[in-house]
């Protein structure tokens, strides 16, 4: 099994209500791809490289899970439209 197949096989073990997971080869590296199932929202796709040594390591399933969860967190945080730290955020009236 080549590295891309190994990553794809591991990702098939995960099923999420909101997100789709896949992997691709891009510029000579393997990337984790995370997308919303509802593509109509027009939000970006998240890409994260996976290091070859991680794929080859005997603990790959655990490392992949940690990386997947970290990337999911980052992806969801990137979806904020406004935060208190936003420079252009005008104060909002409480509802």
Protein language model regions, located:
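Short, charged early-sequence alpha-helical segments and their helix-coil boundaries
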Residues: 42-55
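Amphipathic beta-strand/beta-sheet edge segments enriched in Tyr/Trp
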Residues: 29-44
């Amino acid at each position: 099994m080549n590295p891309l197949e190994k990553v794809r096989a591991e990702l098939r073990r995960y099923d999420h209500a909101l997100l789709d997971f896949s992997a691709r080869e891009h510029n000579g590296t393997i990337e984790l791809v995370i997308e919303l199932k509802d593509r109509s929202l027009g939000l970006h796709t998240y890409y994260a490289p996976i290091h070859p040594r991680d794929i080859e390591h005997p603990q790959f399933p655990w490392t992949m899970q940690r990386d997947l969860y970290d990337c999911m967190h980052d992806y969801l945080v990137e979806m904020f439209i406004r935060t208190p730290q936003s420079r252009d955020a005008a104060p909002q009236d409480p509802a």
